[in-house]
From Swiss-Prot:
SUPFAM superfamilies: Oligoxyloglucan reducing end-specific cellobiohydrolase (SSF110296), Sialidases (SSF50939). InterPro entries: Sialidase_sf (IPR036278), Sortilin_C (IPR031777), Sortilin_N (IPR031778), VPS10 (IPR006581), VPS10-sortilin (IPR050310), WD40/YVTN_repeat-like_dom_sf (IPR015943). This is Vacuolar protein sorting/targeting protein 10. Functions as a sorting receptor in the Golgi compartment required for the intracellular sorting and delivery of soluble vacuolar proteins, like carboxypeptidase Y (CPY) and proteinase A. Executes multiple rounds of sorting by cycling between the late Golgi and a prevacuolar endosome-like compartment. BNR repeats lie at residues 62-71, 374-384, 436-446, 478-487, 714-724, 808-818, 1077-1083, 1115-1124. GO terms for biological process: Golgi to endosome transport; Golgi to vacuole transport; protein targeting to vacuole. GO terms for cellular component: cytosol; Golgi apparatus; membrane. Coiled coil: none annotated. The chain crosses the membrane at residues 1285-1305, 1334-1354. Belongs to the VPS10-related sortilin family. It comes from Emericella nidulans (strain FGSC A4 / ATCC 38163 / CBS 112.46 / NRRL 194 / M139). Residues 1306-1333 are cytoplasmic.
């Protein structure tokens, strides 16, 4: 027997001989590292233990051992210089550290080394995840870096193709730029378009408008070195209003919004070139009301908000090309930021966890949500409740209440899922929840730990780690058997579980974890290591090598996309670790026979959702359908989902052709006939309003609301073919369309009840206003340009005994109201997109001291509660808004005359000062028009544009801006103003301008009338004269102000009623005229008076007799070259109006007429006139066979067509601008006072740029002589002068070069001084420095010429000045701020094309220095 002490000694010796790593530990190791600053962000590098940690003080720490040891990165100035860190999503070795001063860093070796790079502008963060960086999906060295040079500047995109060794400007954009291959799966097939790897996609501003509704989507294959190609989003045509794009696996999604609607459109592509609009059935995509979710390789999943106030949505899944979406589940739970409680399980295909609201009706009525959890095992086709092992229903907190990093429920550990929730009827508070775990991919769940916990997965699911979310936690808990049993280990310090973060490697294969938390208020990091917890590594018998990822209702492995998925997974009770760090469990697949689930619809499903709609148009093969009773084979409408690998043998084949009768084949061509539909009504017409679809609206409706004189409302969704009476029993008084949303209209009644529609008359809702509407004191309802449901209501209140009007505000479409101002007369929202801090800006007219007998004041507020009001004007007459301007008129205290002021920002107002020789007294203003950066106010603005504009008794004037073409305006003037005081009738003439009022001319008359007869007068060179011109009846004579000369879509076309002669005659003598070139030339198209409308963007023009019974209309499809007749009725009716949609893009029209006292509507449909739509292709030399590239021609070609006369200057007969006698130019130094940062100002020249001009370069008539602003001499010299070293080289360098060249020539030239050679002649064999060499003779000649010119130039300048000063008035410039005159360029020569004859025009503007010297 061996003594016991010998056994003990032997055991000790054996223990000492064994390596330390072989010793088994009973708990994981924990190391602690204290941080000196709060952590800002952290991430692991894929497939490594390397971690980056960014602190709030700008330091970046790195750890190469999963958090046990940390060091501060100081490479290339990184210490304290990093504001954010970002991981490359597709390259596991790369990361980026961004600074705030344009200096940034990149690592390409998992943080071992860092390289700095510079980007000129400030970084612009497009998203919190990637910051300013946009990555290429297949080439990690290609990155786009977004910047914004200044807070108000447009984003500027830079790019690199070599990991920022070099960086170049890509382009300036409106939203940002992206790589087309933004995901490795995008365009990865063999038929990838050429240039795809270099292709970039950008959302850029509109060509003219800066509004977001004009944003365009363009792409380039050469980094925009050449002009980009605009994407054809809709039916092969570009679409404006692209606000964002998203890259989701093999899809790119573009979001489009249109002005006038809150409905949005999504366009989807899989190759950038072919786009399709995503269709969601009868669901509308509203603003901020859809979320593109994590999607599969073969479909998109989108959640659509159903009600902006309910926080619920509908989950849709698309087909394989992202075009048609099928509803999966309704009432999904959405958070306030649009996040959806939705997650796909990692690693396993087709399993989706989603939270829904079980009481949607109660929620919409104001109740709290009752959220329940559901799971799908077939990629969202069907859902079922989450069940515990004992059959109880479980509900889990999801995305909207997650408190940890990464995924909410799952990890790459196959089949392991955890979540915090509760059993019962619906989800409770997170603080009352418990931790649940499932090891069968969510099929069954069991309670893991009491109370809410943060959790993580490690070692492919062999280790589960959790920490309580209690405020004070001293331990972590872990499980080694899929959550059945749990153990705990103490932390070195107590941490705050609520704010802690638990994480591990992204692939969940590591045995190491990191806990970020706060200990005693100080940030700290804990590294938790399970590597030494077990002695052995798992062997083959410890694994289930055929674990099924999904089970069907019978518990058998389920198929998805034609295959079953299996994993090799460690058994739950195995006493071992997988210990294969960074080697994820690989799945295996087995094929399945094809079933219905393997097929999708090529287009849309049938109404019952059980079948697919066959193709709408199909041409039978030759030989089929000879007889009507024959049958033919057509596609079924089904197709196998691309990427599905099911076995067709003995399986379902839904995509095989089906047999149908030939009579059902829908391939009949259009009838090429015009159709008409007449409807009769028992009373007359009171009003009609269109609610027009915008680009982003779905549907084919053309909706019209019509109010009869019997106060009945009728609605037509097919442009008057059929009508339905709505709101029966209500006494309708007025239709008020929402001016900023064409889907919305309000229907006012004779009571407090107001009806409304937000879907173009499909449905109607109602509310009760605070007061009865007051129809006598101006507008009742006012609308917010941005917030569709914000309303202002001004109504009369009589509760206190005396009636007065109050202003009320509603932010929920009339459901609730708040009184914002009493004794108010009119209120307006004054929000503008480019007006800072104007979301809550409201202007109201209010009687002083709330006394209706006192004077009117203008009040304003920017307070979101509309309670803090300021007085803008104390003696108001009226105010109005146009474009970016707010104009107000008030009485002066001195003589009670009118004065006007203008504001752009709604806060600061400036007086309008009119030229005193033009407007001696101000009695009435009419704000007739405003374009970008300019206003026309009763024919006058800051400069005189046109004098003696015709005005009626109501203050309206004959003034109309041509739509679509910039700068074209038609106005009527009174040519005999001096005779009016004697009682003479007005003699009107029509004037036109093509440069926004800078110059006006008479309309050029046609030579012949519509019957081919010559007019009584004629002109030469196609220019109107005072004796012979075309004159048109204008705005003041229209029964309906919507009947304009032009159309926004019929480019260049205008029509009007008028006559040829020396003045405008009676309307009874008028004929109908048309122009195709923006008013330069006109032709007579019909004798007599006709009403007109443009259709299909001017492709169809329809005219009908005015104030005369008829049964025929006339139409033209060639812009008025020829006309055809169409008889719309067997009996004559009196047509009182003709209309179409406001955009003039429809092929349908309505004739509004009457027979006796009854209303008649006639829908005239030109849709069948052609059997195809026009095709547009701008890639070729010409646009296409269906389109021509038409460029508007300006009637003037002179340099100063981009300029107008400056304040107190007026146009002369020769076209030049001269100072008005007795007036002074403005003080140019005032510019420096208004712009404190300005360095210089320019002396007045008499000219200033027209606000609308976009010309660049050329001759600047308004900027000639620059002078330094007061106190800015040094900055001015620096800008225009030359530095000391520059001056040194400018003097010394030429002398040195000349000396060197002279010395060389002296030593080499055969004709140098002192050499006299007789009898020698030059030959071709002489050297290059011979006296006859060109290198010698030419420079000598040039030098001699320069010397001669230098001597003669002063004499020439002196001579020219003496000549010019003999006839030019020269004004002193040191006077107060001027107010210019925009005189008639028409007084010049009538055509810009004539040669400038004035010397001052040829040589430039007048130099005023001479006068300054004389005055001094």
């Amino acid at each position: 027997m061996i003594p016991r002490w010998i056994q003990l000694v032997g055991c000790l010796l054996l223990a000492l001989m064994l390596p330390p790593s072989a010793a088994k530990k009973d708990k994981p190791g924990i190391s602690f590292h204290k941080l000196h600053e709060k952590p800002y962000s952290m991430f692991y590098f894929e497939k490594s233990d390397t971690v980056l940690l960014n602190l709030e003080d700008g330091e970046v720490l790195r750890s190469f051992d999963a958090g046990e040891n940390w060091e501060v990165i100081e490479d290339n100035g990184m210490k304290h210089g990093v504001t954010s860190i970002h991981q490359h999503p597709f390259d596991e070795d790369k990361a980026y550290a961004l600074g705030d001063d344009g200096k940034h860093w990149i690592t390409t070796d998992k943080a071992k080394t860092w390289k700095s790079f510079k980007v000129p502008d400030q970084a612009y963060f497009k998203s919190p995840q990637t910051g300013p960086l946009t990555f290429h999906g297949r080439d990690s060295s290609k990155v786009i870096f977004e910047t914004r040079p200044c807070p108000s500047c447009a984003p500027r995109s830079y790019y690199t193709t070599d990991d920022f060794d070099t960086i170049e400007v890509l382009t300036e954009s409106a939203v940002g730029c992206y790589w087309a291959v933004g995901n490795p799966q995008f365009a990865a097939g063999p038929n990838m378009p050429k240039g795809m790897e270099e292709r970039t996609v950008c959302v850029v501003p509109g060509l003219k408008a800066s509004s977001r509704f004009a944003f365009r989507l363009v792409y380039s294959d050469d980094y925009f070195r050449s002009q980009g190609i605009e994407t054809k989003l809709q039916d092969g045509r570009p679409v404006s209003g692209v606000t964002s794009i998203a890259q989701v696996k093999s899809f790119i999604v573009a979001a489009v919004e249109s002005q006038g609607t809150t409905e949005r459109a999504l366009y989807v592509t899989t190759d950038i070139e072919k786009w399709h609009r995503a269709e969601f059935g009868d669901h509308r995509l509203e603003q901020d009301a859809y979320t593109v979710l994590e999607s599969s390789d073969y479909s998109l999943q989108v959640d659509v908000l159903t009600n902006p106030f309910s926080g619920m949505g509908v989950l849709f899944t698309s087909n394989s090309d992202g075009t048609y979406f099928t509803r999966n589940i309704e009432h999904t739970n959405r958070g306030p930021r649009g996040y959806v409680d939705f997650e796909k399980l990692a690693a396993i295909q087709g399993i989706v966890l989603v939270n829904t609201v079980r009481n949607p009706d109660d929620v919409e009525a104001g109740a709290s949500k009752e959220v329940v959890s559901q799971i799908s095992f077939d990629d969202g086709r069907t859902f079922q409740p989450l069940k515990s092992t004992d059959g109880q229903r479980i509900h889990l907190h999801s995305v909207n209440s997650d408190t940890n990093l990464g995924r909410v429920f799952s990890s790459p550990a196959p089949g392991l899922v955890m979540g915090v929730g509760n059993t019962g009827d619906y989800l409770g508070k997170r603080s009352d929840g418990h931790l649940y775990v499932s090891d069968d991919a969510g099929l069954t769940w069991r309670l893991a730990l009491k109370g809410p916990h943060k959790y993580e997965f490690g070692d492919q699911g062999a280790v589960l780690v959790a920490i309580s979310e209690a405020p004070k936690v001293k331990k972590i808990e872990y499980s080694l058997d899929h959550g059945k049993e749990w153990k705990s280990v103490d932390l070195p310090h107590e941490v705050d579980g609520e704010t802690s973060t638990l994480t591990t490697t992204p692939d969940s294969t590591s045995l190491k974890f990191i806990l970020l938390g706060h200990s005693k208020g100080e940030p700290s990091v804990y590294a938790i290591d399970f590597e030494d917890l077990h002695e052995r590594k798992c062997e083959d018998e410890d694994f289930d090598n055929h674990w099924p990822a999904r089970l069907d209702e019978h518990g058998e492995p389920d198929c998805l996309m034609g295959q079953k998925q299996f994993f090799r997974r460690r058994k739950a009770n195995a006493d071992c670790f997988v210990a294969e760090a960074f080697n994820s469990s690989m799945s295996k697949f087995e094929p399945c026979k094809c079933t219905v689930e393997d097929f999708e619809c090529q287009s849309t499903r049938t109404e019952d959702g059980k079948d697919c709609v066959p193709p709408k148009s199909f041409t039978p093969p030759d030989g089929d359908c000879i007889n009507p009773d024959d049958t033919t084979m057509i596609p079924s409408g089904w197709r196998l989902i691309p990427g599905d690998v099911c076995v067709r043998d003995d399986g379902v084949n839904l995509d095989k052709d089906v047999e149908i009768p030939c009579k059902d084949v829908n391939n009949r061509p259009k009838s090429k006939e015009i159709t008409s539909t007449m409807k009769m009504f028992s009373s007359g017409l009171s009003a009609y309003r269109y609610l027009e679809r915008q680009v982003s609206n779905l549907g084919e409706d053309e909706t019209v609301l019509m109010l009869s004189r019997n106060q009945e409302l009728f609605v037509s969704h097919d442009h008057g073919q059929t009508w339905q009476q709505e709101l029966k029993g209500a006494s309708i008084m007025k239709i008020v369309p929402h001016p900023y949303n064409s889907d919305t209209a309000y229907i006012l009644t004779d009571s407090e009840e107001v009806f409304y529609t937000i879907n173009r008359g499909a449905t109607f809702g109602s509310f009760r206003a605070k007061t009865l509407p007051d129809y006598e004191n101006g507008p009742i309802l006012r609308f917010h340009p941005l917030k569709r449901d914000w309303l202002l209501w001004v109504g009369t209140e009589c509760d206190s005994g005396s009636c007065h009007s109050n202003a009320y505000f509603s932010d929920d479409r009339g459901d609730s109201w708040k009184t914002i101002l009493r004794h108010a007369k009119k209120c307006e929202f004054e929000y503008k997109e480019n007006r800072p801090d104007s979301l809550y800006l409201v202007f109201c007219e209010q009687y002083e001291n709330e006394d209706d007998k006192k004077r009117l004041q203008l009040m304003s507020t920017t307070d979101e509660r509309f309670s803090d009001w300021e007085t803008v004007e104390e003696n108001l007459v009226e105010y109005a808004t146009r474009a970016e301007y707010i104009i107000l008129a008030s009485h002066t205290d001195k003589d009670n005359a009118l004065k006007a002021r203008v504001s752009v920002d709604g806060t600061t107002f400036a007086d309008l000062k009119f030229p005193p020789n033009v407007v001696p007294a101000q009695n009435l203003y009419t704000l007739v028009d405003a374009s970008e950066h300019a206003i026309f106010l009763n024919g006058t603005t800051y400069v005189l544009s046109l004098d003696a504009v015709n005005q009626n008794d109501w203050g309206y004037v004959d003034f109309e801006r041509m739509q679509a073409l910039e700068g074209v305006i038609i106005a009527n003037i009174v040519s005999n103003v001096d005779e009016l005081s004697d009682g003479a009738p007005k003699r009107l003439r029509t004037m036109i301008t093509h440069n926004d009022g800078g110059e006006w001319t008479l309309l050029a008359p046609p030579t012949k009338d519509a019957n081919g007869k010559k007019f009584p007068c004629s002109v030469v060179e196609g220019k109107g004269t005072e004796d012979c011109a075309l004159h048109l009846h204008g705005y003041t004579e229209r029964a309906d102000p919507r009947d304009t000369f032009s159309s926004g879509s019929a480019i260049g076309l205008m029509m009007g009623l008028g006559n040829v002669g020396d003045r405008l005659t009676s309307k009874d003598e008028a004929d109908t005229f048309l122009t195709m070139d923006g008013g330069i030339t006109w032709k007579s198209v019909k004798k007599g008076r006709y009403m007109w409308e443009y259709g299909d963007s001017g492709s169809v023009i329809v005219i009908v007799s005015e104030q005369k019974s008829t049964k025929v209309l006339h139409y033209s499809t060639d812009e008025g070259a020829t006309w055809q007749d169409y008889y719309f009725s067997d009996e004559e009716i009196e047509v009182i109006d003709i209309s179409t949609v406001p955009s003039d893009t429809s092929k349908k029209f309505i004739l509004w007429g009457k027979k006796s006292d009854e209303l008649v509507t006639v829908n005239v449909d030109f849709s069948g006139l052609y059997d195809r739509d026009c095709e547009f292709d701008d890639k070729g030399g010409d646009v296409s066979d269906d389109y021509q590239l038409w460029t508007p021609k300006h009637p003037f070609q002179e340099e100063n067509s981009d300029y107008e006369c400056d304040y107190n200057y007026e146009r002369q007969n020769d076209g030049t601008c001269k100072l008005v006698p007795g007036l002074k130019p403005h003080d140019p130094v005032g510019y420096c006072k208004a712009h404190p940062d300005a360095i210089e100002y320019f002396e007045p020249t008499g000219y200033r740029r027209i606000p609308q001009t976009t010309c660049q370069g050329g001759y600047n008539l308004d900027h000639q002589t620059a002078k330094p602003c007061p106190g800015k001499q040094q900055e001015y010299d620096k800008k225009h002068g030359i530095s000391g070293i520059g001056l040194f080289f400018a003097i010394v360098a030429p002398i040195a070069v000349a000396g060197a060249v002279g010395y060389y020539i002296y030593t080499k030239w055969d004709g140098k001084f002192g050499q006299i050679r007789l009898g020698e002649t030059s030959t071709g064999t002489q050297g290059i420095l011979s006296r006859d060499s060109l290198l010698v003779t030419v420079p000598i000649a040039i030098i001699a010429g320069i010397v001669a010119v230098a001597k003669a130039l002063p004499l020439l300048v002196t001579s020219l000045w003496r000549s010019a000063s003999g006839y030019m008035r020269v004004g002193n410039r040191s006077y107060p701020r001027p107010y210019a005159s925009r005189a008639s360029f028409a007084a010049r020569r009538g055509d810009y094309s004539s040669v400038v004859e004035d010397e001052d025009e040829l040589l430039g503007v007048v130099d005023f220095d001479g006068d300054e010297e004389e005055d001094s």
